[in-house]
Every structure is written in C-alpha cells, then in structure tokens.
Amino acid sequence: MPDTTGGHPAALKVVTLDGPAGVGKTTLARRVADALGIPYLDTGAMFRTMAWRLGPDGPDLDEALLRDRLAGFVFTLRGRGGASVLSCNGEDIGNEIRTEEVGAMASRIAALPVVRECLKAAQQRMGAAQPLVVEGRDMGTVVFPGARHKFFLDAAPEIRAMRRYTQLQTMGEAHDLALLTEQIRSRDEQDRNRAVAPLRPAADAIIVDTGDLDIDGVFGVIMQHIRSRDGL
C-alpha cells in the first residue's frame, strides 16, 4: 500500500475537515469538493456502515473474529464533488445509517484500534489514488497528516444539537432537543478522550468556529484559505 501518512505527494492533494458532530462538516465538504472539482469522502459514513452491518454486538466481538468480518468490507468511491457516491461491497450507502442509534454504535466501534486500522488503510488508498475532500474526526492528525489543507470546525454543543434536531425533523424523525444535547456532550467526551485517535485539531489546522457563521460564511473562510495558499 502506498505511504500516504507523511510526505507522499498524494497526501498534499487532500483537504481535511475534522470536527465533532453537528458542525456542518458534511455540507461543507460537499460544497468544497464541488468548488474544487474533486471527489468527496465522508469517513463517518464508513464507520456508520460498519456499525450498521456488524450490529449492536459488533464492538463486543472477539478481535480475531472482528478482524475477519472487517476484511469483508470493501469501500469504493465514484463521482466528483458533492455528487460523489460511497459504496460498500457494491451497494451504495444510503440514509439507513443516519439514525441516532447507528451513530451511537459507530462511536463505540470507532474506539476499537482494529476498526480504525482497517478504515485508515481504506481511506489512505483512496487518497493515494486521487485528490480528495475528506471529512471526519482524525483526518488531519492520523489518516492524512501530510494533507496540504487542514481545517477543524467547532461549535458549542447547544448549537450543534439544534442543528441536528432540525436535520432530523427534515428526515421525519422526532427527537427531544435536551436529550440530543446530552447525547452530543457524551459523544464529545467519548471522542475526545478515547485512547486511539482522539478528536483534536492538527497542530497546523485552521480552526473555524461555526457557531457565529452560517454555512456560506464558513465555506467562504475555507475557500479563502485554500485559494490564498494555492495562489488561485
């Protein structure tokens, strides 16, 4: 497998957007990919897909059995910009993975080194093959530390919970806002304090507080930094 963890040229063509749940990573990553004309990779969807397919008992599987199960997942990416489509074993990934239940399971399996090792290899293969806009929680720190453009998006838990609440309403799901806020705080705690690849900004990442900006404002900040550095 090509080394994309350091100075590999392919890593320089990657734009990373990291941050906790609810900061707008998905929407922004799609827009940036559209603007740059390159594929977009939602790594959170990869974790959610694994969690959904492994089921509630996935995190408790014996490591050897889990490793064997993980070897059966093959992710592929096609298309460009926001229209990029991620597939697993030939099946396009849909909204079935976007529930709060699957999100909670994904956070659990994301703490397992064997899972992160498997997905890191898959993500690096994609980044070695083509330029990418990639979103996640450790893209700029662990998966693509040599990426040319790194951004870390953040906002207060209350703001992120409201955004998630609105998003779920549009999907026809009813949720309690106070409970969503508590779930986001709990997931933040878990993601920031896990032993493997904790959620944190890369030392050279541009940190953007999305709480006081709308999507257009954050998009403008990101594109300004990219164009300035690349002389566009």
Swiss-Prot record:
| Subcellular location, record wording | Cytoplasm
Gene Ontology, cellular component aspect? cytosol
- Record's keyword terms, sorted: ATP-binding, Cytoplasm, Kinase, Nucleotide-binding, Transferase
What's one Pfam family here?
A: Cytidylate_kin
* Record-listed E.C. numbers: 2.7.4.25
Gene Ontology molecular function, alphabetical: ATP binding; CMP kinase activity; dCMP kinase activity
What does the entry give for GO biological process?
Answer: nucleobase-containing small molecule interconversion; pyrimidine nucleotide metabolic process
Record's catalysed reaction(s) = CMP + ATP = CDP + ADP; dCMP + ATP = dCDP + ADP
Which annotated residues bind ATP? 19-27
The domain of life for this entry's organism is Bacteria
> Do the record's keywords include Protein biosynthesis?
no
Q: Does the keyword Transferase apply?
A: yes
Predominant subcellular localization, coarse grouping: cytoplasm
The record's listing under HAMAP family reads:
Cytidyl_kinase_type1
* Family (UniProt): Belongs to the cytidylate kinase family. Type 1 subfamily.
Return the PANTHER family for the record.
CYTIDYLATE KINASE, CYTIDYLATE KINASE/PANTOATE-BETA-ALANINE LIGASE
Q: This chain belongs to which protein, by name?
A: Cytidylate kinase
Q: Which organism is it from?
A: Nitratidesulfovibrio vulgaris (strain ATCC 29579 / DSM 644 / CCUG 34227 / NCIMB 8303 / VKM B-1760 / Hildenborough) (Desulfovibrio vulgaris)
Q: Mind giving the lineage of the organism this protein is from? A: Bacteria, Pseudomonadati, Thermodesulfobacteriota, Desulfovibrionia, Desulfovibrionales
